[in-house]
């Protein structure tokens, strides 16, 4: 299943760093990422394996609806966000700080 390398590098937008994501990383070996809205689970799995060099056990996705916010008199709406919870295979470890430092050196 040959996926486009360029597409895979664009699928993952950013890691999500929150209290919940830190607990998941420590207890369940899961990483949380913000991904493109039209990204599929196989694409997300392939992208994480390509970019970080780790084995992925499974991917769970959830689309969070954007909140309605007021801007003065007008009502605006924040964008919907798709999150991917990526479970790493047993024995695999992903250090985002080290991965970011390695990417900066290239």
Curated annotation (Swiss-Prot):
It comes from the Bacteria. It holds the Pfam family Ribosomal_L23. The keyword Ribosomal protein applies. Keywords: Ribonucleoprotein, Ribosomal protein, RNA-binding, rRNA-binding. One of its GO terms (biological process) is translation. GO terms for molecular function: rRNA binding; structural constituent of ribosome. GO terms for cellular component: ribonucleoprotein complex; ribosome. The keyword DNA-binding does not apply. InterPro entries: Nucleotide-bd_a/b_plait_sf, Ribosomal_uL23-like, Ribosomal_uL23/eL15/eS24_sf. Part of the 50S ribosomal subunit. Contacts protein L29, and trigger factor when it is bound to the ribosome. Belongs to the universal ribosomal protein uL23 family. One of the early assembly proteins it binds 23S rRNA. One of the proteins that surrounds the polypeptide exit tunnel on the outside of the ribosome. Forms the main docking site for trigger factor binding to the ribosome. PANTHER family: 60S RIBOSOMAL PROTEIN L23A (PTHR11620). This is Large ribosomal subunit protein uL23.
